[in-house]
Amino acid sequence: MYMRKHYLLIIILFLLVGCATYKTKYVESSTVGNISGDSELLHTFYLIGDAGKSPMNDQSEALKAFQKALGKAGKNSTALFLGDNIYPAGMPNKKDSTQAYLEAKNNLDAQLETLSQFKGNPIFIPGNHDWYNEGLEGLERQQKYIQKKLDSKEVFFPEDGCPIEKIDINDKIVLIAIDSEWYLTNWDKHPKMNDKCEIKDRETFFEELESLIKKNRDRTTILAIHHPMFSYGPHGGQYSAKLHLNPAGGKFPFPVLGSFVNLIRKTSGASYADLQNKRYTELRNRLVTLAQYSQKVILTSGHEHTLQ
């Protein structure tokens, strides 16, 4: 009887731990200040991340809403796609699997369709899933597909699997596109990944980022990077009650066991997609420190499938 009560208390404890709310947070209306009508609107950014999964011959609900917003946007605007542009595993070679290629093409086309009435400029950056099909080769297939579809070389950054690239939006705004998967991935698996890049090691990457931030400290500097530096989602070690019951997000619950799996994930840092990972932590600490060289740095990221 004692042991039964003991296990019951453990189960209740795990359930209470999982009872956090991860709904979208809104600022109370009373705290919103008035924006001066004399302020000049320099540029508008429309952000979407992890948009690389849509039904065949259709768009996801998020992309439909995104397209509607872009249709009303003016010329001085940018649509920024924050990586993971193709689920589940990047752009395959058409010769290897026709079905996989058609699904990947569908997922990209659904995003490109959002730009049909858009008067501004689109920018795509890569995420970790975009590296999951032959690494650099799959990434370059995606890059070339987007460039060809949009008839422009100025739409996918950084190019050629390189880590960082600066894009001048206007005289007062600069965007720095960073491929965080370049930093996090196992380089031994991609021996040719830096052949087309001026930057060939991680330390030089940080030096270049520091230089760009300092040179543009008088301009609003947007760092577009797929992996977030801060997160209250699963990649940051925060799990909803649903994920405590089934870490994979499936239908069948695994109480206690599911929470144990999440605990191991949170404390081990085994996955370099999670903030607790040693290399991810290294990237985060250095990047956050460098961002403080300017008071005008804004971080924008995807990765987590939430608004935060």
What is the meaning of each model-derived region?
Residues 1-6:
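Positively charged n-region of N-terminal signal peptides that target proteins for export
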Residues 10-17:
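Bacterial N-terminal signal peptides
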Residues 19-102:
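N-terminal active-site segment of His-dependent metallophosphoesterases
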Residues 22-33, 90-221, 234-274, 278, ...:
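Extended active-site neighborhood of metal-dependent phosphoesterases/phosphodiesterases
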Residues 45-47, 79-81, 124, 223, ...:
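Residue-level marker for buried hydrophobic side chains located in beta-strands
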Residues 50, 83-84, 127-128, 178, ...:
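Active-site glycine-centered loops adjacent to acidic/histidine catalytic or metal-binding residues
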Residues 69-74, 215-218, 294:
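Glycine-rich phosphate-binding loop signature in dinucleotide/nucleotide-binding domains
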Residues 81-82, 86, 216-234:
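Short acidic, glycine-rich surface-loop motifs adjacent to enzyme active sites
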